[in-house]
Design a protein with these regions (language model features):
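Basic, nucleic-acid-interacting segments
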Residues: 1-453, 493, 628
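Short amphipathic alpha-helical segments and their helix-coil junctions
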Residues: 478-495, 509-515, 523-531, 581-590
Length: 632
């Protein structure tokens, strides 16, 4: 395997940031931008591909059509209406959303158009009931300064968010409509050359600018970063769905390594004599050969009435398993492609015998395909209507391997890799929206938007430090967290220490997440109530973590129930002193032996029984006082 050097491959990365706007209503109707928990309405759609005005088909639409999926939509009248169901024309554009985008365009020194045209962007994966997403270009050009470098802005757009996917089977894909239509800002930056950590800094700086407006949503799922990655000699690959900054560097590094590995593979292929695969002569039905095979994947498919097909690739032996870098193989790329047709997978000759496919089947395949010594083969099983388009895509992908890096769209995974999603869209993907007239941007709107440009990053952090007496590190943590607005609301209560509130929101919740607990279960209303109870003296500081832990674990959503079950209602001072008197008497030997140093072990014993029932600092003070009295 080769040694990968990321700074020697001509890496270029372009960022597209998609951020939900906090404007309460959806983009083209009056439905609130809220998340539903129940969906009493359900309906089904089968989206079909159609030609553009120029009579052309978009490649992504053709690809999605080949999967032949039924789309199931779930809706709640509290968060969606007939507009989301595509049973009613869109209403006028959300003026608040438009004004926020104008402000951000000004902040980026972008040139705003005086007339905005709504367009339809073809989307046929089912995430839009209409088969398209409404989007409008608001401005072009501009820049963002990051660490002394000026990063160009390509465009700023306002668009509607897609439906939320709930699940997928081989034949269906299921969505919820509560997210569909929520206003999004899309900012596309110019591609930059540099290391992944530099790209992360750019994304962080842009995210901070957006958050400084206080008009964008926060939390997982409210911001998504699409990353366009290319290397010297390769096409641009779009990576969708990067939700966390921590993922960004790993994904860029993996994708750069994957692409360079494909370039190495193509270089090797171009030094070989290869024939183009002929579907008529090189593809055979080998179902009967596998009737009694031990492969669980193939046997499962056969029980469902599948066919098994084999493809001959002349002079290709060893190329599916060739690994220029660890984990980068052409066989793996083709496996990703096949899975998106709803097939269990594909087997290639470089990995066989294995997976229940034995020498007896391999021998029969070689005979049926008339293989020569240096030939390779692929085997796949599934319904005929899925296998046929999958074979066409495999043949094209093998041809693309000779070129190097094919232009495609991939999806980011949680472990920092990418998997195949679909082909790159073509120019015929976008066409005008006929239900909405052009939107005029008035001079008054421009003046008002310019007045709303947020303070700089440095000014914002300085203001947090001075207003709440935070150190610089904690001020940055508060601003970058999902709870900065909530922090300011909680700190209006003068009984609460801003430093303690910041520590809970930025450290306690993060630590609970690291233990595998789910912060999405912790609502802002519950956080506010917990701090109100603390301010009123009904619970101790230590109770906050106990309450959050119970909610984030999914055990209960009721704070009253947690207080009752965990026995964390606050002790009064008389009861506390009585309990500590009993504790000292029960451990009087420790007090006499260790004297003043006995505070440590006694404090540990006290906190085991009184954690959440009394403030730790008060327990410590009373213990110290009572130990001194005993020793005197």
């Amino acid at each position: 395997m080769s040694e990968f050097q990321i700074d020697k491959i001509g890496l270029k990365v372009g960022l597209e940031i998609h951020q939900q706007l906090a404007v309460k209503k959806k983009l083209f109707c009056n439905c609130p931008s809220v998340e539903s928990e129940e969906y009493p309405i359900q309906f089904f759609r089968k989206l079909r591909v159609s030609k553009s005005e120029l009579g052309e088909f978009d490649p992504t639409a053709i690809f999605e059509r080949s999967k032949s999926k039924t789309i199931v939509y779930n809706a709640n009248p509290e968060s969606s209406c007939l507009v989301e169901q595509d049973e009613e024309p869109p209403h006028e554009v959300n003026e608040n959303a438009k004004n926020v985008v104008l402000t951000i365009a000004f902040a980026l020194k972008s040139i705003i158009f005086n007339e905005i045209h709504v367009m339809r962007k073809l989307v046929i994966d089912g995430s839009n009931t209409s088969g398209f997403q409404r989007t409008m270009l608001v401005s072009q050009g501009g820049y963002l300064d990051v660490d002394g470098k000026r990063i160009g802005v390509q465009s700023v757009s306002l668009e509607e968010d897609a439906a939320k996917i709930l699940g997928e089977t081989a034949d269906t894909r299921e969505y919820a409509l509560d997210r569909l239509g929520i206003p999004l800002i899309e900012i596309a930056l110019e591609p930059v050359s540099g290391k992944p950590e530099e790209v992360r800094k750019i994304a962080l700086a842009l995210g901070r600018l957006l958050r400084a407006t206080k008009k964008v949503e926060r939390g997982l799922g409210t911001i998504r970063q699409d990353v366009n990655v290319s290397i010297q000699g390769g096409n641009v690959v779009e990576i969708k769905g990067v939700q966390k900054l921590d993922q960004l560097e790993k994904i860029i590094e993996y994708e750069a390594r994957r692409q360079h590995g494909l370039v190495i593979i193509s270089s090797k292929l171009n030094n070989m004599t290869l024939d183009r695969i002929a579907k008529e002569g090189d593809v055979k039905n080998v179902t009967e050969i596998f009737r009694n095979c031990k492969s669980t994947v193939i046997q499962k498919a056969l029980k469902e009435g599948a066919v098994v097909k084999a493809i001959r690739i002349k002079n290709f032996s060893g190329m599916f398993g060739f690994e220029p870098y660890q984990g980068i193989r052409l066989g793996k790329q083709i496996g990703e492609l096949v899975r998106f047709f709803g097939l269990g997978g594909v087997f290639h000759s470089d990995e066989l015998p294995n997976y229940g496919i034995e020498e007896i089947e391999i021998k029969e395949i070689k005979k049926t395909l008339e293989l020569e010594q240096n030939d390779a083969f692929l085997v796949l099983a599934g319904e005929m209507k899925k296998v046929e388009p999958a074979i066409e895509s495999i043949i094209k992908r093998i041809e693309d391997a000779k070129v190097g890096v094919p232009a495609e769209t991939r999806m980011a995974t949680s472990d920092g890799e990418t998997i195949y999603l679909r082909p790159r869209p073509g120019a015929s993907r976008m066409y005008p929206e006929t239900d909405i007239p052009p939107i005029i941007v008035t001079e008054t709107e421009l003046v008002d938007a310019q007045k709303m440009i947020p303070k700089s990053w440095e000014e914002t952090i300085s203001e947090l430090e001075n207003t709440y007496d935070l150190n610089p590190q904690l001020a940055v943590q508060v601003f970058d967290s999902n709870y900065s607005d909530l922090f300011e609301i909680i700190c209006q209560d003068k009984n609460l220490s801003p430093n303690f509130v910041a520590s809970v929101l930025c450290s306690t919740i993060t630590n609970l997440e690291r233990q595998g607990l789910d912060s999405k279960l912790l609502k802002s209303s519950e956080i506010l109530r917990a701090f109100n109870l603390l301010s009123n003296g009904e619970i101790a500081k230590e109770s906050i973590e106990i309450i959050f832990s119970n909610i984030m674990s999914g055990k209960t959503h009721s704070i009253d129930e947690i207080i009752k079950n965990a026995s964390i209602s606050k002790m009064d001072l008389i009861e506390l002193e009585s309990v500590l008197d009993d504790l000292i008497e029960a451990n009087i030997n420790i007090v006499h032996e260790q004297r003043e140093r006995s505070i440590g072990p006694l404090m540990g014993i006290a906190m085991k029984t009184m954690r959440g029932k009394a403030d730790g600092q008060i327990i410590n003070q009373i213990l110290e006082k009572k130990i001194r009295e005993k020793l005197d």
